[in-house]
Amino acid sequence: MADGQPFVIWVVFDVKPEAFDRFYEAALDDSTGSVRDEPGCLQFDVLAPTAGGNKFAFYEVYKSRDAFVAHMEMPHFKRFAAVADVALNDKNVSEYYRLQGAAK
């Protein structure tokens, strides 16, 4: 089923309050760099809850799992990972294959 299907990462981050701004800047840098510099990155959304708080979510879509693995070697990801290492209370990562997508 996975052959030829886009690879999706869904990550929810619980950010330490004192690291919120730094994490936010690093998240935007990673998202922008991923879409701009990686042909295998199809979409990278940075989300915040409507009720506020210190949570973020990433919705990332790659052409393949290999494209995601390549993403983790990019300079913008390494900068983000360095910030996340000290900015997070917790994170939850889920991996999916996109079976169908629709957008307007």
What are these regions (language model features)?
Residues 7-14:
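Active-site-flanking beta-strand signature of metal-NTP-handling nucleotidyl enzymes
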Residues 16-18, 49-51, 63-65:
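Short coil/turn motifs at secondary-structure junctions
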Residues 22-26, 57, 72:
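Generic recognition of short, well-ordered alpha-helical segments
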Residues 1-7, 45-54, 81-104:
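Glycine-rich beta-strand-turn "strand-cap" elements at beta-sheet edges
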